Design a protein with these regions (language model features):
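Contiguous beta-strand/loop segments that form the cofactor/metal-binding neighborhood of enzyme cores
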Residues: 1, 188-270, 315-329, 346-349, ...
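Predominantly a Rossmann-like dinucleotide-binding segment in NAD(P)-dependent oxidoreductases
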Residues: 139-210, 356
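Conserved SAM-binding strand-loop segment of SAM-dependent methyltransferases
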Residues: 59-66
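Intrinsically disordered, low-complexity Ser/Thr- and acidic-rich flexible linkers and loops
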Residues: 4-7, 80-94, 283-286
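Beta-strand-loop-alpha-helix segment that lines the small-molecule cofactor/substrate pocket
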Residues: 77, 88-140
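Short, Asp-centered acidic motifs that coordinate Mg2+ and/or phosphate
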Residues: 41, 61, 77, 162, ...
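N-terminal Rossmann-like dinucleotide-binding module
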Residues: 1-57
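C-terminal helix-rich "cap/oligomerization" subdomain common to oxidoreductases
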Residues: 1-11, 17, 77-82, 131, ...
Length: 363
């Protein structure tokens, strides 16, 4: 992707921002350098923090009441990055609906809600108001995952037959899963691997959880509606020095691997066959047009592609949403439809282990 700098866009979206915490400060506000965003106002319950954010990121005004900001400012779009309430539930549904009813498009960070019912309500209000909502499922925008999506969509890759993924997350014991406060970490993180699985494998038909009671790790068997088989390894218990994630997708005669979110290896279809027991060198089965392809960024040059804002999907997800809004289009990825399935999957995880749990259609 070729990147346009903020000042190069001929038109920009008048933007407000609710939330001035550490995550927003590090990872979301800085993306506006590369998006068609005119940051007009920011809001935080802590007025000092709001004033600081306004000063650092160039907002004209700051507020400690989001309703006051919505009433006073002429905005096109609001970004919302907040924490959970006292019950452990994300604050996004109410805040997003307030913004939608004010006639504004909305970008919210993940996790977008604590229930699929809250997602359905946001879908209803979004449809009612004609305003779009995007959700920060950043892993749908990792360059390695986007490239993987491109490769598996090619006819020569064949239909996806199986997917395996690894993510270091603990699933709380069943007796704790009814308490949203004890599920905060799981809800916050489980959307990461499942958003990638949705991007690459499509909707899920059911999951089956086999959990280890000692540390809360699990092997999750998955059936995609396409018929592909899936396996998600929740690998808590691993060393803190270990790599965190791995993904493999197998088609029909080809496969690819994404390691540590940046290293992609595409094992292409072999165009020759070697009789077993007759090959004297390991290059015999490979031709230049069928050897594996390998990608990994360099970390020497001062490029955008090796910045965390781009490698971790933050800038690409913001650029996608804002540029499509300028074109009068809805987001393609990180949609409320994506969010609906991910919350239905989260609800399935809250049920007892060792049982197949169907995932409802995300219609």
């Amino acid at each position: 992707m070729l990147v346009t700098y903020n000042h190069e866009y001929p038109k920009q979206l008048r933007t407000g921002f609710i939330g001035c915490g550490g995550h927003a400060y590090r990872n979301v506000y800085p993306t506006f350098q590369y998006a068609p965003v005119n940051l007009v106002a920011v809001c935080d319950l802590d007025p000092v923090r709001a004033a600081t954010c306004a000063k650092v990121f160039g907002a004209e005004r700051h507020y400690s009441d989001h309703l006051e900001m919505l009433a006073r400012e002429e905005l096109d779009l609001v970004f919302i990055v907040t924490n959970v309430d006292e019950h452990g539930r994300p604050r996004y549904p109410k805040l997003a609906i307030d913004c939608l009813r004010a006639g504004l498009h909305v970008w919210i960070e993940k996790p977008p809600a604590s229930s699929s019912g809250e997602i359905r309500e946001m879908i209803r209000v979004s449809s009612e108001t004609g305003r779009h909502v995007a959700v920060g499922f950043k892993k749908m925008f990792f360059p390695a995952n986007v490239k993987a999506k491109e490769i598996v969509s090619r006819p020569e890759f064949g239909p996806i037959t199986s997917i395996t993924a690894r993510y270091p997350q603990s699933l709380p014991p069943f007796e704790d899963r009814g308490d949203s406060r004890k599920m905060v970490s799981f809800l916050d993180h489980i959307v990461h691997p499942h958003s990638v699985l949705r991007l690459l494998g499509g909707p899920i038909e059911w999951i089956f959880v086999n959990r280890n009671s000692a540390v809360g790790s699990a092997i999750v068997s998955i059936r995609f509606t396409s018929g592909a088989a899936g396996n998600l390894h929740l690998s808590t218990g691993q060393s803190s020095t270990s790599f965190l994630e791995r993904l493999e997708i197998i088609g029909d005669g080809e496969n690819l691997v994404v390691e540590n979110n940046i290293r992609l290896i595409h094992y292409r279809r072999s165009k020759s066959k070697i009789e077993y027991g007759r090959s004297g060198d390991y290059f015999g089965a490979l031709t230049d047009d069928s050897a594996p392809l390998y990608w990994e960024p360099e970390f020497s040059l001062g490029q955008l592609y090796n910045k965390g804002l781009f490698l971790l999907g933050y800038a690409p997800e913001v650029i996608q949403f804002t540029t499509r809004l300028l074109d009068g289009k809805a987001p393609v990825h990180g949609t409320l439809k994506d969010a609906l399935e991910l919350l239905q999957i989260y609800e399935a995880y809250r049920r007892p282990d060792g049982i197949i749990h169907p995932i409802k259609e995300s219609s």
